[in-house]
């Protein structure tokens, strides 16, 4: 039996692997783009298939396709959406900028599967791609996949992380520690206040995503080649988007302006920026956790993180903050992905952006990485954090910054002298004030001194 079969397209004949569900145009793309070995994301394949199914249904309702052909296409597209044929999507991410190769890959696989079901030919262009163009289908598929990933994966993952941080904020509400600005001692805070701040960062990330969703969920579907809707029957655009929204359960809407929606990718660029902001926030959180857990003997050691794996191939007993480090790498990747999306988003000329596949790859990867690492950070680090209250309080009470409440009794300059003397003589602020005769002179009473130097009270003025 031959290892190949002959397929043809408008450019002629092409040899295709005998068992491949794709056809000529996909094979040409495979041969033209052996670039990275990276294929489009699973979520993206699903989104393309959802469009093909919805389009077939609406085309049948509008008299463009026969019912049996449309039914076969819907069944085939359903299997593709479920992931049963992912190995038949071999086209590299770095391909034609409109995503035509991946759109045709979808058309051809669905056409082959539908032909097998129907017993007669289903054409990838005339039937599966009816009333469509790569120029409206592919950007729509990006927005569908990204909307699904953000709403179903990333937002729940961030909510999970925020909840873990909020629980720790409550647990550590009375654990007083030295505040730090510029990595230098500052007035006291509680560990709970810091964790509450981290939780708020994550919650605000969710708010940012939700704010960008209305534009992310707008689809140019139905605009076909240049946004005019040429070759579509009346009512197709609204009907097909309504069907995709129904089938996916996503809050998808028709683009308010099809020319903006095909010529520009501002909605997805905006979302990528929100993803970068979330990554920046996670970087801050992860670094703070690493600093507070540094040690065990020569660092801050205010908290302990769960021990997850040996940290060194040469130093026995060493354990490292591996999850926070993974978070930092994800954040760096997301920042780089956003730079790519920004550059690619600027690549629109007239009626079409021509860097769509790389936009899709980077945005969907960012969502996936952030969602995964947020869950890991919550489950394998935050939930297991243990505070060391005595150590934290010792730092807070020994910090020269606790002199700050004495400003109103001694004045700023005299309080500064106290702080410098305490540092130079390696004494506490309390010792220095008492030995300096400030109480004896009547600058303040011992009771006022006690209240002023109550480090927990300083966190709740």
Curated annotation (Swiss-Prot):
GO annotation, biological process: fumarate metabolic process; tricarboxylic acid cycle
CDD domains from the UniProt entry: Fumarase_classII
UniProt-annotated site: Important for catalytic activity, residues: 325
Enzyme's top EC category: lyase
Keywords attached to this entry: Cytoplasm, Lyase, Tricarboxylic acid cycle
Any one of the GO CC terms: cytoplasm
Disulfide bonds: none
Keyword presence, Lyase: yes
GO MF annotation list: fumarate hydratase activity
Compartment(s): Cytoplasm
This protein's pathway: Carbohydrate metabolism; tricarboxylic acid cycle; (S)-malate from fumarate: step 1/1
Catalytic residue positions: 182 (proton donor/acceptor), 312
Catalysis: reaction(s): (S)-malate = fumarate + H2O
Family membership noted in the UniProt record: Belongs to the class-II fumarase/aspartase family. Fumarase subfamily.
Function: Involved in the TCA cycle. Catalyzes the stereospecific interconversion of fumarate to L-malate.
NCBIfam families: PRK12273.1 (NF008909)
General remark: There are 2 substrate-binding sites: the catalytic A site, and the non-catalytic B site that may play a role in the transfer of substrate or product between the active site and the solvent. Alternatively, the B site may bind allosteric effectors.
Subunit structure: Homotetramer.
Descriptive protein name: Fumarate hydratase class II
Source organism (scientific name): Streptomyces coelicolor (strain ATCC BAA-471 / A3(2) / M145)
Classification of source organism: Bacteria, Bacillati, Actinomycetota, Actinomycetes, Kitasatosporales
